[in-house]
A protein has these predicted regions:
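Active-site-adjacent "subsite" loops/lids of carbohydrate-active enzymes
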Residues: 210-226, 293, 298-350, 504
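Extracellular beta-sheet/turn segments enriched in Thr/Pro/Gly and aliphatic residues
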Residues: 113-134, 196-213
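Short, acidic Ser/Thr/Gly-rich low-complexity loop/linker segments typical of extracellular
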Residues: 152-154, 162-176
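Aromatic-lined carbohydrate-recognition surfaces of secreted/lumenal glycan-active proteins
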Residues: 290-300, 357, 383-422, 463, ...
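Glycine-rich, aromatic-flanked loop segments that form ligand/cofactor-binding clefts
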Residues: 242-245, 273-322, 355-359
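A short, solvent-exposed loop/turn motif at the edges and junctions
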Residues: 185-196
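Structural motif
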Residues: 135-154
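Substrate-binding cleft of secreted/luminal carbohydrate-active enzymes
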Residues: 433-444, 456-463, 469, 476-540
Length: 541
């Protein structure tokens, strides 16, 4: 790598000051506006040969707020949404406002009101098979993995003592236990994980189907009791049953006291620290909530700044290259970068998450791309092995500790036969994942899809076709498709509000195409509760 020059210490100091100012600004915004942040600058358009469309926007977008607007439109594929009167009242008042009745909620951290903890409507079904105290595994452990109807689940993962094997066509397995081996974890995409305590008799592991229906909590949102309480209300009262939490956010910060040496050395301990993070995850799990750790991977301003030898380099300056948000990226070809992210994911698994989801697991799409230099030539022949190689290693290492592994991909990967110039192609990625999570926001399809030039006017069709094509291209693998859906105002076409009709159309499109659950994206964590079905024994799972 080229040296940064004599001005490097001064530049590094200025960058740290800028990061500090950015953190203070975000914290102030979170307090005053319920975590509203400004949209990123418009990226430069590029043309990708032999593809449906080039990527011209970042994969994560900013909701521009909601307003009542006109009466909701009707969309093809839109089935009856829940009546407003059938849903509980979920007031979304800003923290600074008074609660109904004029009473001000009790102050908590950063002055936010603390909502009462909301117990589940019914005790969640157990996800553990306990055993008597003092019981240990026999030397050879055998058993079967079944679904609730007693049918075998071929290919289910059985994890014991850091080793993972697959059940055979009859759902049967046999493995050797080590002295002092802890609990066994049994899992299969589309089902809840099952934790089995040591026992002497053969194991009969019955897995329950799980279609995760999630809301996203930002790096700052998860630390805010007001925001967290509103999402908890939705988890308790509506069909939501899962949550996505930033474990390494868009700037590379970690929201809890990390013990990963490389992260501490890089300064990844963020400005917000949740003291009892394990307790938070345990509380979600006690409510029957499926927990997903989001790890932003190759977009990492913290690591790139601390370790410029691992960064994408700007050929004009010899310093870390930055995108349109002035954030640096680390080099996807560097296996030390792979190890860094996997170790952070391991720590998330130890804290109790069910799944690790890698985001920005790709090459950059905006900024002066021609000035970006990598450890290897940047071409399709090199990009695909880099991204797929990272995911293969992550799935191998994290699968052996008992968590599911997922990755976020652009929605256009459903249609493009190329790698979209970012190292993402379904056929190469699917074999190394439990869940593949396309970002099928209609606003993100800036030139439409075949047959639909205006995607925001056709949310059902856009989501349905995207999920259908990805499932088709992933045939022969165990991966399940769980898309990200749009719960924010359109920013690319007519700025329409995405309300009940648009959100239900997306959900129906995913369900009808065979998606296994879905996730709602809103960077303000301000979700449209009226679009969600009320909680019921069937909707809860």
């Amino acid at each position: 790598m080229e040296a940064a020059g004599e001005g490097a210490p001064k530049a590094a100091a200025l960058r740290h000051l800028a990061d500090g100012g950015y953190a203070v600004g975000l914290l102030a915004s979170a307090v005053l506006f319920g975590y509203a942040i400004l949209p990123p600058s418009s990226p430069q358009a590029r043309t990708v040969p032999t593809t449906v469309a080039a990527v011209t926007s970042t994969d994560r977008t900013i909701g521009l707020g909601k307003s009542p607007g006109p009466a909701p439109p009707s969309y093809p594929g839109l089935r009856a949404a829940p009546r407003e009167s059938a849903l509980p009242s979920l007031a979304r008042t800003l923290p600074a406002e008074r609660a109904p009745g004029g009473a001000r909620p009790a102050p908590t951290e950063r002055g936010r009101g603390r909502p009462a903890l909301l117990p589940p409507l019914a005790p969640p079904a157990p996800r553990e098979m306990p055993a008597s105290e003092g019981v240990t595994w026999p030397e050879r452990v055998s058993g079967r993995v079944l679904d609730p109807d007693g049918l075998p689940l071929a290919g289910a993962s059985v994890v014991l003592a850091g080793r993972e094997l697959r059940a055979d066509a009859d759902g049967a397995f046999t493995l050797t236990a080590s002295p002092g081996s802890g609990p066994m974890i049994v899992k299969l995409p589309g089902y809840d994980r099952l934790v089995v305590a040591p026992r002497r008799e053969p194991v009969e592991a019955v897995l329950r189907p799980r279609a995760a229906k999630a809301a996203y909590l930002t790096y700052f949102g998860v630390a805010d009791r007001g925001i967290r309480g509103r999402v908890l209300a939705l988890l308790t009262r509506t069909e939501l049953n899962a949550v996505v939490i930033d474990v390494k956010g868009d700037r590379g910060w970690i929201p809890y006291r990390t013990e990963v040496p490389a992260a501490l050395a890089a300064g990844a301990q963020g400005p917000v620290i949740i003291r009892d993070f394990e307790g938070l995850i345990a509380d979600f799990r006690a409510r029957g909530v499926y927990t997903i750790a989001r790890v932003v991977t190759f977009k990492d301003n913290v690591l790139a700044t601390a370790r410029p030898d691992l960064a994408v380099v700007d050929t004009r300056t010899g310093k870390p290259w930055v995108d349109n948000e002035k954030l640096a990226w680390v080099d996807p070809f560097r296996e030390e970068v792979w190890a860094y992210n996997i170790e952070i994911a391991r720590e998330a698994a130890r804290k109790g998450f069910d799944e690790v989801q890698f985001d920005y697991v790709r090459f950059p799409t905006d900024g002066r791309l021609g000035s970006a230099r990598y450890a290897k030539p940047n071409s399709r022949a090199t990009r695909l092995p880099a991204v797929a190689g990272f995911l293969e290693r992550a799935r191998r290492e994290l699968g052996a500790v008992g968590v599911y592994v997922a990755a976020d991909v652009f929605g256009y990967t459903a249609f493009n036969e190329s790698d979209t110039d970012i190292g993402q192609r379904i056929e190469e990625l699917a074999p190394h994942l439990d869940y593949i999570c396309p970002m099928v926001y209609p606003s993100g399809y800036h030139v439409g899809i075949p047959g639909y030039r205006n995607p925001v006017a056709n949310p059902y069709a856009v989501v349905h076709e995207s999920v259908r094509l990805i499932r088709k291209r992933a045939e022969g693998t165990q991966v399940r498709v769980r898309p990200w859906l749009q719960d924010f105002r359109d920013y690319a076409f007519d700025r329409r509000v995405f309300g009940v009709a648009e959100i239900r159309a997306q959900i129906n499109g995913s369900d009808d195409a065979g998606g296994v659950g879905w996730m709602l994206w809103n960077p303000r964590n301000d979700y449209t509760g009226e679009a969600l079905l009320p909680k019921s024994p069937l909707a809860a799972r």
